[in-house]
């Protein structure tokens, strides 16, 4: 009897963490509108502004489609900057502010970031199918708010720590650890100002910073369009401009 009881307790102890993870995530998905509504999103356009520092604001538009397609445009100092575009398995950027009028292919590290951004459902939904692992690390206070602490190890090996409000069941903070150019880079993102858009509950304030780096980047979202008709050619890398022949 003692052996059977011990075996039962060991079995429960083995299953409990996975059950806890799935239970917390199920409540999180429901709080955001439910899996059916989340998976029904085929495209999205987000309009807002990015604050890069005191007095430095820039309008921004992010367009996204399923099939790993995402594009960000920022208007700054009279120029349209496109720091990231992903079109399936290829990516590019166009940054005339850096003196180059032509598009450039994303580096392997930039591609890694872009692919994570392009996951419309986020890395928590279907995390096992995507090759990620999730661990529940207990509860922790985040600026006075009780939160579930979840460690996510992405398929790439990068680590994300997600804090989910125990009352609202919505994400309030994300910490990241990534390897860039052989060095570990740490960052954090605060999520807030959640609003309902077509049955989905979405954060409209995203405050990000990198450990050891000055300043923070704040994205304030003013409009979200669900399933807008997007022009797929906008994700295609444009041809390079011809360089005028020198005048003889």
Task: Enumerate the language-model features and the residues they cover.
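Positively charged n-region of N-terminal signal peptides that target proteins for export
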Residues: 1-5
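N-terminal signal peptide c-region/cleavage motif recognized by signal peptidases
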Residues: 13-15
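Gly/Pro-enriched, hydrophobic low-complexity segments
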Residues: 18, 71, 77, 143-238
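N-terminal mature ectodomain segment of secretory-pathway/periplasmic proteins
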Residues: 22-99, 131-138
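Acidic/charged, solvent-exposed loop-and-adjacent secondary-structure segments enriched in E/D, K/R, S/T
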Residues: 92-121
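Short, conserved active-site entrance elements at the starts or edges of catalytic domains
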Residues: 113-151, 170-175
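Compositionally biased, proline/threonine/alanine/serine-rich low-complexity intrinsically disordered stretches
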Residues: 240-248
């Amino acid at each position: 009897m003692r052996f059977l009881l011990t075996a039962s307790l060991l079995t429960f102890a083995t299953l409990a963490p996975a059950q806890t993870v799935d239970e917390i995530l199920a409540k999180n998905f429901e709080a955001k509108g439910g899996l059916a509504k989340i998976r029904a999103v085929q495209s999205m356009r987000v309009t807002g502004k990015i604050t890069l520092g005191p007095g430095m604001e820039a309008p921004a538009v992010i367009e996204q489609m399923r099939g790993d397609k995402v594009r960000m445009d920022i208007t700054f100092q009279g120029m349209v900057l496109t720091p990231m575009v992903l079109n399936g398995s290829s990516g590019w950027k166009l940054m005339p502010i850096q003196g180059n009028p032509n598009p450039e292919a994303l580096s392997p590290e930039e591609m890694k970031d872009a692919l994570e951004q392009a996951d419309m459902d986020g890395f928590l939904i279907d995390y096992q199918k995507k090759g990620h692992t999730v661990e529940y690390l207990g509860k922790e206070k985040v600026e006075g708010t009780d939160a579930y602490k979840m460690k996510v190890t992405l398929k790439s090996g990068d680590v994300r720590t997600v804090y989910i409000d125990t009352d609202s069941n919505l994400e309030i903070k994300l910490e990241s650890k990534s390897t860039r150019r052989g060095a570990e880079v740490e960052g954090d993102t605060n999520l807030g100002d959640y609003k309902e858009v077509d049955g989905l509950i979405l954060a409209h304030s995203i405050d990000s910073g990198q450990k050891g780096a000055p300043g923070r980047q704040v994205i304030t979202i003013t409009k979200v369009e669900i399933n807008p008709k997007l022009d797929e050619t906008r994700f295609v890398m444009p041809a390079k401009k011809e360089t005028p022949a020198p005048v003889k």
